[in-house]
A protein has these predicted regions:
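S-adenosylmethionine-dependent methyltransferases
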Residues: 1-136
Length: 136
């Protein structure tokens, strides 16, 4: 959130919080960037916590139960900012996260920010994306 606050020059109008969990990053974007936020998670059991956390914080997000691979070019092409925090913690998530980021880039998503504590699966994603698309 500090990174987004310090590096966001233009306010994104639309944000997807991929692998949102309880949704803190997306809720922050809704509240502080006044963005329309879709919060996606594969686990339907997190949605009540997401909704409660949003309510407590006075923010509105749209919960979506789905997987990374469910984010198609139709949705990503209309997205200003794709965020994900701690979403690549298992080896099985490498390919779906790479596919999501690739689809976002090819669809014209304006900005992608993925945060991670530098686990090995995430580093594999980084290597692939840097090799094929560049980035920081």
């Amino acid at each position: 959130m500090d990174y987004l606050a310090s590096t966001t020059q233009t306010q994104p109008k639309t944000v997807i919080d991929a692998g949102c969990g309880w949704g803190l990053s997306g809720i922050w974007c809704a509240k502080h960037l006044q963005a329309t936020v879709a919060s996606l998670d594969a686990d339907p059991d997190v949605i009540p916590y997401l909704e409660l956390t949003a309510k407590i914080n006075g923010a509105e997000v749209t919960p979506i139960v789905g997987r990374f691979e469910d984010l198609g070019s139709d949705l990503l092409s209309a997205t200003d900012l794709l965020i994900g925090a701690d979403i690549c913690f298992w080896d099985e998530l490498v390919d779906p996260v790479i596919a999501m980021i690739t689809t976002a880039i090819e669809s014209g998503t304006k900005r992608i920010v993925i945060a991670d504590p530098q686990r090995a699966p995430f580093l594999a994603v980084c290597e692939h994306i840097l090799e094929h698309f560049g980035g920081e």
